[in-house]
């Protein structure tokens, strides 16, 4: 009887030990299995989960616009007063709804090339008004022409054309005209061939961004989605040194197994440069654990604070000898037009930039850019890309409508918020196919290990207790 009991206790301890060992072995084996499956599914080729969602995003993406309506145009033009602006919006468009075009795999270098077509559909139900709403904004053509043509004789000719067309420093335009283009009366009088249509995003519809050529990950999963070339080049030709490099992905996805310590680099054609994001916090997105990465203020710092940014400073006067920060002069990629990009309401910008503008209220929560990334797959499941479009206008002795200005202005025209969030159906699929299976495997591992250890310890204690009684 004693033997049977002892044998049973030993058998229980052995079973517990086996379960614990099996649970322990399952951990690395399970991790390897997960890695193998993920690596297979994030490759950008026909038949994978990644490819299907990459060719045409299943997420609805919206671009909201807030326009800075100028309240005191005459005071500014006559007295060089601070510009008083009133934010109006949002005006919402659906974007990025078109599938990638000319998708071509290259087996030799394991890349895939494509064009990203552009399209925008106005969403009245998500907007405060219509595309016919009027705004008082800086005259884009007058500001640009006076900057591009600085020869005084040429500016005298420009002045006569500006006066003849009855143009001024400011203008009234509809939302549709401001965004997508209008025929400018001043440019229409220029006696030599110039583009007479002006708009902040002209041309947009029926155009495409690219060609992009990205690594498909077949030979090296750590390079998947990373851009090899953009428009056939590895550099942009806008900046000096490392600032001109095309780094990272397009931010729609990143190589799998993202770590919190990583600096995620990505390229944005909207701002004509590569930029980066750093980990901020863990976020639960519809039951899916994601990492929130944000653009840090350091990315917009002056070279004085962040020496890596020295090559983004391209002139000395407006930047106050490269000490100003928070705005990026992208005129080189806008055919010389004095376009400056910043975060909305000049968030993270130096006081000298925003000082001439009244009515701004920078708010980090509302105006910063972030990416919510599922770390195992590297997929961006939610994002908010926020930026502001500004135009530089300077005094001019020869152009009457700019003659009374006593300082330079970086004038905010609008800011945009482009957002996308994984839909409920896609989130359910993602939970069942990815995070659910991983969590289930982890649960099984812990149960086997825990039960095994408890059984082994309990049966061994019982066995020792029984032996002690038997000896007595």
UniProtKB/Swiss-Prot annotation:
Cross-link Glycyl lysine isopeptide (Lys-Gly) (interchain with G-Cter in ubiquitin) per UniProt, renumbered positions: 469, 472
Effect on the protein upon substituting residue 254 to L: In PG4D; type I
Region: Interaction with PTK2, PXN and LYN, residue numbers: 460-472
Signal peptide: none
Segments on the Extracellular side according to the record's topology features: 30-439
Glycosylation sites: 79, 102, 134, 163, 205, 220, 235, 247, 321, 417
Cystine pairs: 243-311, 272-333, 313-322
Molecular functions per Gene Ontology: amyloid-beta binding; cargo receptor activity; high-density lipoprotein particle binding; lipid binding; lipoprotein particle binding; lipoteichoic acid immune receptor activity; long-chain fatty acid transmembrane transporter activity; low-density lipoprotein particle binding
Keywords: Cell adhesion, Cell membrane, Disease variant, Disulfide bond, Glycoprotein, Golgi apparatus, Isopeptide bond, Lipid transport, Lipoprotein, Membrane, Palmitate, Receptor, Transmembrane, Transmembrane helix, Transport, Ubl conjugation
Main location as per UniProt: membrane
S-palmitoyl cysteine lipid modification positions: 3, 7, 464, 466
Gene Ontology CC: apical plasma membrane; brush border membrane; caveola; cell periphery; cell surface; endocytic vesicle membrane; external side of plasma membrane; extracellular space
Disorder: Platelet glycoprotein IV deficiency: A disorder characterized by macrothrombocytopenia without notable hemostatic problems and bleeding tendency. Platelet glycoprotein IV deficiency can be divided into 2 subgroups. The type I phenotype is characterized by platelets and monocytes/macrophages exhibiting complete CD36 deficiency. The type II phenotype lacks the surface expression of CD36 in platelets, but expression in monocytes/macrophages is near normal. Coronary heart disease 7: A multifactorial disease characterized by an imbalance between myocardial functional requirements and the capacity of the coronary vessels to supply sufficient blood flow. Decreased capacity of the coronary vessels is often associated with thickening and loss of elasticity of the coronary arteries.
Function according to Swiss-Prot or TrEMBL: Multifunctional glycoprotein that acts as a receptor for a broad range of ligands. Ligands can be of proteinaceous nature like thrombospondin, fibronectin, collagen or amyloid-beta as well as of lipidic nature such as oxidized low-density lipoprotein (oxLDL), anionic phospholipids, long-chain fatty acids and bacterial diacylated lipopeptides. They are generally multivalent and can therefore engage multiple receptors simultaneously, the resulting formation of CD36 clusters initiates signal transduction and internalization of receptor-ligand complexes. (Microbial infection) Directly mediates cytoadherence of Plasmodium falciparum parasitized erythrocytes and the internalization of particles independently of TLR signaling.
Subunit structure and binding partners: Interacts with THBS1 and THBS2; the interactions mediate the THBS antiangiogenic activity. Upon interaction with a ligand, such as oxidized low-density lipoprotein (oxLDL) or amyloid-beta 42, rapidly forms a complex with TLR4 and TLR6; the complex is internalized and triggers an inflammatory signal. Through its C-terminus, interacts with PTK2, PXN and LYN, but not with SRC. LYN kinase activity is required for facilitating TLR4:TLR6 heterodimerization and signal initiation. Upon interaction with ligands such as diacylated lipopeptides, interacts with the TLR2:TLR6 heterodimer.
Family per similarity comment: Belongs to the CD36 family.
Protein name: Platelet glycoprotein 4
Lineage: Eukaryota, Metazoa, Chordata, Craniata, Vertebrata
